[in-house]
């Protein structure tokens, strides 16, 4: 070989192998933008480098971009300068040939000359391999991948070393040839390994094709970090994050790209996609779209293909939003000015169709007929145009012959939209045909999308505008009033809406429509959630505020809140005043205020609103023509009936039926009329009018579902309930009907039959995950747990669905198969320990929370806490990117679950700490505030209880638990009146609220109003006669009987509760029984004299009572020793005549009575010590001890034992004949307990000893009345004092009452009654 040639090749190799960072970056940029169709941007990159450096390969690439832009003369002039370049001539020649061939009138002579020159240069051995490499590069962009590969192979053979550019171009050519093997990836990795940026771009492309979003993000992130100023790296990272649906990360990438707004069109496309699909901020969206348009005008002003592509993207993700479609039209106008390509005209028709512009659709349709265009919108343009002016028969005639001429139409979703409209307006108006066409539309769209990873190309095909057209077509079949279950129409629309929302959660109107769907199936909680999601994206959405007002009224919320929502909606759209819906909701607010006349006036105003002209456009839903008029008529009828204007109501119904006769709305009216009959209790009438709807009529489906509900809920007829669904299945044997019949059998608790129908539906619709979930639930309901587990496992593997995994884990948890449950939950967590996309993070959080529950069940608390901490950490990752109300609530929920675990384990300090974390997420969170209140209450920290409790009541004034805690707070603080009011409020809502009832009995009996306490006890029994068997009621009734002196009845009540599983009521009952055992019928067996001079009988009686009390005390021992238990234990021990035992018990009480600083901490223990001294006849220390309580503030906690202390002091003074001092203490007792029978007894004794029998009789009369005149002992004392005061007839009457209670009470007859009669005879 010639030495000169060899030397040249060595120089070439040096040049090729030299790592020129700036050249590589520039070439990689140009390659990237050219592949992506941003030819103008690529030219700007070329010009930027060529202005400072002579770079022939880059100059040739500029020529390629000029050809792609259609600037042929300029491209030819530019490329001719390099056709003789020694190193790159082949590339320039191929580019020149391409340019000439692309001209409007190709110069054949020039093309022949160029081909000859190419052939000559290619055969020349002196041609350097760089020239072949350049040729391969040009041919790649020309789409001639096979020729490109041949040239690159020659370049490789002539080069002794292969470098990054070679590997990378070979990889791209392989991709162009459809090769996506591992070898292609290795080529890109080799190029990337030499720090050639386009090599890493190739890696990203391969991973994108494999749908490997996480790996793509890692690769793009490496590129973005290693070459910070290489913009395609940031773009690819953003695309990876879009694939992961991490929209917050996308915006971070846009910011990190550090590009001036509007300077780079690709960045602006990403910003616009983020704005429409996620941000949803309408006010910002206008500016975003304007920035994108400006960027294209500045960088790609003659790139009509890019204008058209972006137009299609915007239309596809618009959700048929009018504002977005009008912006899209601005982009397309620029493309059409540059080129009138048929596809662009078809796209223009699609926009006009979306805007409902029938005239423009007609004009464009005529143009498309003359053009050769295979776009479905073009093929069906004339049919579309006809349907937009109601020419149904002409449209059908054309439509029927279309598939024969264009077979591929059957794969187009748009074809099925047209078919659904024609089915809806056919003679039979078959809903089933309509529904099937919509299902086909969804299926075809999914088929088109399934091979594409989620990204720009996916969004280009998504067609949310088309889906929304299909959704609107379903509106005509919607119910007018909320139903109890979704029908097929709403299931269908919910499916499509969810598809749109999953792709573009920024489309607020989609969230609003999902809210409306939930509202119409009476799922108010879900409806509220969707309304907030809609307003989160667009708070100016007037319809969302109106629906919120509707929801507030239907849920019985505050009327003012509903009014506020109405006003807010009106502020955003004043035209709402012209709609029936606005007046309908306004009338409901008047009805809630019982302003029926104003409601009637508002409804009549609504009916006088001028009827909107019905559109001829069959693609426009009738809802836009204000079908709420029917709802107004029904509401008017209902209001007239409520106000007893029956004739007016019937006339209005007749007018409505006449107005809508023969129209589809008539059937809607029939359904609503049936609902109206039902609210009036006319079940048969409701069934009769529903039965009139026959197969083929639009509301047949809904009528049978409604009939089934009536048979089940009103008539309790399961047979007819199933028959309605069987009739549906007979008429419409579709997967939906089989599924509905399965639902019906699930509703009547017959899961085995349900499984058969679900399985049949799944055979017909094998990809339906929801059906699979229903089968699993049916297996569980049928207690076929092994089958359920196997089914969930197989379904989890088939559908790759997170819900299946969660359901399986939940079931395993219920079955106590903790090991397998943990394994199922661990698998996805271990597979991706640090997820980055929002959806995966949210799924992981659900897995972790369930795993924490699993760990708690096996007592692995440290692991459970780790699960909670990991869940919180993952949640914080999402919240760092966005800070929505929903996310804050979710963060609070996670904290609450952890706090509740601490609370269950009585670990209060960490529970308080986690509750405070929850409040940092969401400061008005109810659960955390309630839990804090509960913890402070359990810790007896009442000063801290009030703040979290009031925080709850500010948000939810009717919260029962908060009101109860507040009532207890007042009770503990001895604010009896406030406490009473709060408890009564709770009882008015729920007469069976035992805690509140117990407190009310206590408070009323202390006030001396025991008859009122009895009324509440009777109210509970009236509300539920079976409540007498409940422990709560038994303890409340026992307490009442104890206060009224009937200890035998009290004991019977308490005995019913002593074995209750409810620990609270069981303990109360047992302590009360022990107290009665030690002091039966308030008769003192033990006193100082009986201990001093113990008789055998007294000792035996005391021992028997002590033994009985001990039995019940032992039952309490199972709960565990508490302070109250130790007190009861010592009182039982003290109930003896043995002085040593009494002294030992005093020592025990001493240990409990005082704190380290000798301050009193237990009034009960002080009473125990004093009673012990009193029994041992040590009156002086007893008195000194009791006097130490002087000045102690009375409170409900100490009330019982404070009263006992005062009574004991009074008894000591009565024994010492110190009447005045005794009276002081007895008055103190009666001040806080007007029904204290022991106080009455001691007071009576004192007055008798003073021989003040009149006063004594008054006291005994109070005591006798307090016991409902059932106490023989008080009856005897009253009769005795009446005898002494010579009130003889009243005395005899009292004696008779006692004998009526207990005929075996001869003492009263012999000692009092006979004497009184004798005294009457002698006077």
From Swiss-Prot:
GO terms for cellular component: cilium; intraciliary transport particle A. Keywords: Repeat, TPR repeat. Pfam families: ARM_TT21 (PF25058), ARM_TT21_2nd (PF25060), ARM_TT21_4th (PF25068), ARM_TT21_5th (PF25064), ARM_TT21_C (PF25063), ARM_TT21_N (PF25062), TPR_7 (PF13176). TPR repeats lie at residues 56-89, 411-444, 580-613, 667-700, 702-735, 736-768, 770-802, 804-835, 845-878, 892-925, 927-959, 961-993, 995-1027, 1031-1064, 1203-1236, 1238-1270, 1272-1305. The keyword Repeat applies. Coiled coil: none annotated. One of its GO terms (biological process) is protein localization to cilium. SUPFAM superfamilies: TPR-like (SSF48452). Belongs to the TTC21 family. This is Tetratricopeptide repeat protein 21 homolog. The lineage of its organism: Eukaryota, Metazoa, Ecdysozoa, Nematoda, Chromadorea. The gene is ift-139.
């Amino acid at each position: 070989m010639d030495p000169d040639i060899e030397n040249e090749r060595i120089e070439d190799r040096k040049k090729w192998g030299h790592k020129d960072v700036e050249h590589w970056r520039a070439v990689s940029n140009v390659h990237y933008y050219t592949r992506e169709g941003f030819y103008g941007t690529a030219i700007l990159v070329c010009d930027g480098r060529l202005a400072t450096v002579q770079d022939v390969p880059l100059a040739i690439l500029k020529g390629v971009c000029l050809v792609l832009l259609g600037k042929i003369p300029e491209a030819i002039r530019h490329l001719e300068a390099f056709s003789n370049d020694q190193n790159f001539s082949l590339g320039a020649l191929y580019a020149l040939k391409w340019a000439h061939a692309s001209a409007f009138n190709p110069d054949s002579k020039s093309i022949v000359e160029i081909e000859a020159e190419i052939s000559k240069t290619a055969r020349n051995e002196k041609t350097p391999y760089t020239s072949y490499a350049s040729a391969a590069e040009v041919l790649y962009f020309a789409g001639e991948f096979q020729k490109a590969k041949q040239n690159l192979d020659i370049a490789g053979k002539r080069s002794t070393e292969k470098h990054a550019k070679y590997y990378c171009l070979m990889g791209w050519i392989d991709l162009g040839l459809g090769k996506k093997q591992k070898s292609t990836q290795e080529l890109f990795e080799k190029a990337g390994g030499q720090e050639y940026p386009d090599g890493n771009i190739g890696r990203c492309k391969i991973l994108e094709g494999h749908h490997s979003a996480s790996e793509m993000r890692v690769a793009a992130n490496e590129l973005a970090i290693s070459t910070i100023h290489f913009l395609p790296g940031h773009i690819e990272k953003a695309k990876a994050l879009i694939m992961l649906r991490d929209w917050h990360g996308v915006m971070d990438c846009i910011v990190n790209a550090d590009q001036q707004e509007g300077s780079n069109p690709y960045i602006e496309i990403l910003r616009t996609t983020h704005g429409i699909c996620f941000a949803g901020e309408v006010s910002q969206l206008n500016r975003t779209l304007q920035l994108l348009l400006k960027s294209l005008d500045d960088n790609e002003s003659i790139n009509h293909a890019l204008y058209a592509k972006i137009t299609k993207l915007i239309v596809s993700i618009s959700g048929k939003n009018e504002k977005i479609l009008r912006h899209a039209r601005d982009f397309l106008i620029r493309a059409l000015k540059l080129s009138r390509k048929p596809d662009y005209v078809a796209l223009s028709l699609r926009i006009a169709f979306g805007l409902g512009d029938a005239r423009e659709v007609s004009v464009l349709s005529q143009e498309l007929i003359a053009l050769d265009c295979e776009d479905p919108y073009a093929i069906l343009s004339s049919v579309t145009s006809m349907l937009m002016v109601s020419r149904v028969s002409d449209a059908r005639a054309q439509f029927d012959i279309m598939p024969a001429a264009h077979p591929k139409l059957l794969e187009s979703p748009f074809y099925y939209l047209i078919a659904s409209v024609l089915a809806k307006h056919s003679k039979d108006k078959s809903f089933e045909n309509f529904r099937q066409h919509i299902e086909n539309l969804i299926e075809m769209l999914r088929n088109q999308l399934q091979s594409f990873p989620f990204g720009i190309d996916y969004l280009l095909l998504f067609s949310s505008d088309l889906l929304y057209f299909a959704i609107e077509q379903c509106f005509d079949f919607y119910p007018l009033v909320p139903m109890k279950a979704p029908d097929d129409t709403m299931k269908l629309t919910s499916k499509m809406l969810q598809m749109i929302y999953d792709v573009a959660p920024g489309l607020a109107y989609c969230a609003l429509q999902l809210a409306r769907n939930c509202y119409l199936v009476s799922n108010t909680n879900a409806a509220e959630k969707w309304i907030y999601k809609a307003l989160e994206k667009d708070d100016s959405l007037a319809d969302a505020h109106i629906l919120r007002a509707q929801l507030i009224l239907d849920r019985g919320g505050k009327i003012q809140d509903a009014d506020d929502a109405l006003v807010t909606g009106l502020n955003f759209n004043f035209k709402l005043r012209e709609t029936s819906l606005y007046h309908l909701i306004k009338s409901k607010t008047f009805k809630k205020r019982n302003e029926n006349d104003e409601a009637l006036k508002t409804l009549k105003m609504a009916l006088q609103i001028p009827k909107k002209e019905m559109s001829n456009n069959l693609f426009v839903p009738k809802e836009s023509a204000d079908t709420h008029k029917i709802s107004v008529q029904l509401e008017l009828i209902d209001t007239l009936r409520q106000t007893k204007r029956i004739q007016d109501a019937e006339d209005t119904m007749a007018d409505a039926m006449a107005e809508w006769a023969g129209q589809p709305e008539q059937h809607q009216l029939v359904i609503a009329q049936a609902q109206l009959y039902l609210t009036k209790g006319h079940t048969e009438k409701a069934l009769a009018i529903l039965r009139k709807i026959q197969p083929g009529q639009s509301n047949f489906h809904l009528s049978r579902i409604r009939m089934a509900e009536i048979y089940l809920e009103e008539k309790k007829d399961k047979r007819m309930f199933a028959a309605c669904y069987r009739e549906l299945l007979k008429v419409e044997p579709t997967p939906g009907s089989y599924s509905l019949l399965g639902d019906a059998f699930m509703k009547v608790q017959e899961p085995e039959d349900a499984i058969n129908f679900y399985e049949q539906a799944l055979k017909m619709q094998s990809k339906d995950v929801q059906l699979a979930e229903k089968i699993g639930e049916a297996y569980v309901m049928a207690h076929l747990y092994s089958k359920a587990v196997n089914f969930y496992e197989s379904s989890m593997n088939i559908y790759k669905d997170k819900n299946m995994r969660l359901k399986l884990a939940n079931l395993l948890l219920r079955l106590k198969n903790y090991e397998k449950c943990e394994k199922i939950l661990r698998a996805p967590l271990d597979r991706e320990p640090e997820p980055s996309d929002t959806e995966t993070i949210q799924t992981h959080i659900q897995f972790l929370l369930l795993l924490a529950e699993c760990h708690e069940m096996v007592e692995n608390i440290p692991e459970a806490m780790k699960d909670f901490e990991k869940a919180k950490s993952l949640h914080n990752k999402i919240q760092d990117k966005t800070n929505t109300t929903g996310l804050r609530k979710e963060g609070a929920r996670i904290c609450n679950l952890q706090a509740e675990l601490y609370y269950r384990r009585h670990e209060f300090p960490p529970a308080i700490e986690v509750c405070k974390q929850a409040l940092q997420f969401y400061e008005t969170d109810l659960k955390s505030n309630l839990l804090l209140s509960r913890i402070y209450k359990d810790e007896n920290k009442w000063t801290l209880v009030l703040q979290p409790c009031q925080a709850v009541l500010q948000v939810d004034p009717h919260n029962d638990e908060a009101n109860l805690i507040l009532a207890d707070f007042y009770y503990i603080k001895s604010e009896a009146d406030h406490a009473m009011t709060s408890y009564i409020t709770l009882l008015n809502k729920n007469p069976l609220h035992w805690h509140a009832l117990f407190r009310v009995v206590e408070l009323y009996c202390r006030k001396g109003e025991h008859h009122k306490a009895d009324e509440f006890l009777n109210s509970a029994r009236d509300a539920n006669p079976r409540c007498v068997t409940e422990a709560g009621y038994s303890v409340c009734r026992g307490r009442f009987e104890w206060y009224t002196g009937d200890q035998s009845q009290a004991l019977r009540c308490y005995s019913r509760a002593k074995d209750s599983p409810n620990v609270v009521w069981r303990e109360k009952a047992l302590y009360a029984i022990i107290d009665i055992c030690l002091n039966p019928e308030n008769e003192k067996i033990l006193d100082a004299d009986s201990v001093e001079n113990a008789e055998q009988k007294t000792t035996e009686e005391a021992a028997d009572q002590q033994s009985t009390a001990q039995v019940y005390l032992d039952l309490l021992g199972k709960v565990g020793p508490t302070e109250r238990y130790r007190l009861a234990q010592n009182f039982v021990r003290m109930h003896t005549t043995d002085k040593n035992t009494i002294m030992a018990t005093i020592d025990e009480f001493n240990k409990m009575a005082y704190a380290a600083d000798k301050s009193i901490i237990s009034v009960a223990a002080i009473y125990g010590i004093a009673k012990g001294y009193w029994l041992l006849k040590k009156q002086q220390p007893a008195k000194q001890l009791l006097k130490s309580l002087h000045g102690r503030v009375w409170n409900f906690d100490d009330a019982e034992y404070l009263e006992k202390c005062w009574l004991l002091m009074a008894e000591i003074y009565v024994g010492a004949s110190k009447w005045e001092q005794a009276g002081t203490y007895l008055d103190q007792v009666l001040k806080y307990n007007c029904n204290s029978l022991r106080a009455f007894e001691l007071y009576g004794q004192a007055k008798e000893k003073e021989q003040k029998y009149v006063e004594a009789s008054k006291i005994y009369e109070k005591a006798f009345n307090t016991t409902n005149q059932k106490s023989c002992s008080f009856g005897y004392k009253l009769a005795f004092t009446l005898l002494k005061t010579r009130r003889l007839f009243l005395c005899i009457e009292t004696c008779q009452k006692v004998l009526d209670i207990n005929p075996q009470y001869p003492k009263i007859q012999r000692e009092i009654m006979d004497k009184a009669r004798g005294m009457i005879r002698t006077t």
